[in-house]
Amino acid sequence: MADLTTKYLGLNLKNPIVVGANNLSADQNKLKRLEEAGAAAVVYKSLFEEQIQLERAQLDEELTEFDERHPEMIKTHPDIEHSGPEEHLHNLEKAKNALTIPLVASLNAVYRETWVEYVKKIEETGVDGLELNFYHVPYSFDEDGKSIEDQQIDILREVKKNVSIPVSVKLSPFYNNLLNVIRKMDEVKINGFVLFNRFFEPEIDIEKEEHRFPFNLSSKGDYKLPLRYAGLLYNNIQGDICSSTGIFSGHDVIRMILAGADCTQVVSTIYINKFGHIGNMLSEMEKWMENKGYN
């Protein structure tokens, strides 16, 4: 049998197929099914800044709800131990204990303080690694690209100071010079780069004249941009390369590995072709290796 093992973030993977962060990965039963289907690792559904800020706002509201009442009318402030991001952390720990394959947490924050606070909490759950999802849409005409890049690199520097687990960063291709940005992040000792994330893309229903929120899946052929950057980065950075977007088949995975990637992330193909497709992808890879005489 062909040897499909690889290494990513210092983790030994049985093959190069990692399931990226998505709604499926937040369900423990589905996580087990992904593991049984052959996934080498899973990235747990992202924790977003909005969830964290919402919990804080709700807590503030709950803690002051009874301030004008007589103290004998209430017992204690509401217990929110397992709500919002706290529930996310609780479920993350449960998921880690349920799986035998590596589990990577994903965080999508905005403020520097939030990044630092929550990477510490995430590390305490026992996960094997951390993926920081940099999803930044500037709303100011005065904010230049360099200031955004400097802020992100500063965040990465602080995160690396505060955790010992391996850290990867998931980036968009929309930088002035992506290679330069990755080199600077690599100098901060980031362990891996996931290329690329998918932005939320709005739509408008012209009949109802209102916003529509389509399910934003990638398409076959979308792999060509990450393929290009896997090749450009290979042997030029210390961090690992994980290709993401448009990877639908075992042949797509092979393309990425040949270009220089250490592993790949898949999501859309799981939604479209279901969990068992991971096995089909692995079979395609094994057959290709056998035909080539590789072991």
Report residues per predicted region.
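Thr-Gly-centered strand-to-loop micro-motif
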Residues: 20-21, 220, 243-244, 266-267
